[in-house]
Curated annotation (Swiss-Prot):
This is NADH-quinone oxidoreductase subunit B. GO terms for molecular function: 4 iron, 4 sulfur cluster binding; iron ion binding; NADH dehydrogenase (ubiquinone) activity; NADH:ubiquinone reductase (non-electrogenic) activity; quinone binding. NCBIfam families: nuoB_fam, PRK06411.1. Transmembrane segments: none annotated. Belongs to the complex I 20 kDa subunit family. Its cofactor is [4Fe-4S] cluster. Its main location: membrane. It holds the Pfam family Oxidored_q6. Coiled coil: none annotated.
Length: 179
């Protein structure tokens, strides 16, 4: 399926040569387009379940939603994963472990924050022992709201991450442009 909003397809060469059946583009744009497409359709998330949101995260891997058919395969090791799904209440004691696991992931790496506790502290926001959002520890690409969010909401968040990777608008590209 061709996305008509792609920057590769909407450049001046595509507009002028579309009717002739071929496309002229820069080689680097084509390589970026293909690599982003491949990355977005083969996500390997690592679960970082901390509370009740982890149960909903497990539902997405079960037979009803079956993320395997979308190219999403859960991994147990951070060295094999490229997506971290943080689900649940992040405490001050667990924050260094989250950062350590995030640092062990290979580039490019993405983070999905799942649930109101991971997004901003949730119900325990005013507790002395709770981090008020995992984005204070690791850069987050997608926020999935809810308490707990449904499996459909996480599935939608994964689809949004795939679209974001296709556009090239993720934390890995933001970091390289800031240097």
């Amino acid at each position: 399926m061709i996305n008509k909003n792609d920057s590769v397809l909407n450049n001046q060469f595509w507009q002028s040569y579309n009717h002739q059946g071929f496309m002229v583009t820069q080689f680097s744009d084509l390589i970026n387009y293909i690599s982003n497409w491949a990355r977005s359709n083969s996500l390997w998330p690592m679960t970082f379940g901390l509370a009740c949101c982890a149960v909903e995260m497990m539902h997405t891997a079960a037979s009803r939603y079956d993320l395997d058919r979308y190219g999403v395969m859960f991994r147990a090791s951070p060295r094999q994963a490229d997506v971290m799904i943080v689900a649940g209440t992040l405490t001050n004691k667990m924050a260094p472990a989250l950062r350590k696991v995030y640092d062990q992931m290979t580039e490019p790496r993405y983070v999905i924050s799942m649930g109101s506790c991971a997004n901003g502290g949730g119900y325990y926001h005013y507790s002395y022992s709770v981090v008020r959002g995992c984005d204070r520890i690791v850069p987050v690409d997608i926020y999935v709201p809810g308490c707990p969010p449904t499996a459909e909401a996480l599935l939608y968040g994964i689809f949004c991450l795939q679209q974001k990777i296709n556009r090239g608008n993720t934390s890995i590209t933001r970091k390289s442009t800031q240097d």
